[in-house]
Amino acid sequence: MRVDKFLNAVCITKRRAIAEDMCRSGVVSINDNVVKASKEVRVGDTISIKFTTHTDSYKVLAVPTSKNVPKNAQSEFVEKL
């Protein structure tokens, strides 16, 4: 699954367009490598998002098969580090 779709599916971003913009701006990285929106996410990857005041990191536990995941099921797919 593409990183922009993944961020939207597991409710890290509200819209896929926001995730695409974040990737285009260079604030999203997987395993310490800045990535484009089309980068594939795999189980075990660490996704980091840089904000102006802090950085959020998430470990991918599973890749969802559906387009959207309920917010209460987010912990099945990502673990906040």
Which residues make up each language-model segment?
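A basic, amphipathic helix-loop patch mediating RNA/tRNA/ribosome contacts
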Residues: 1-40
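Short, charged beta-turn/beta-strand-edge "cap" motif at the junction between a beta-strand
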Residues: 34, 52-56
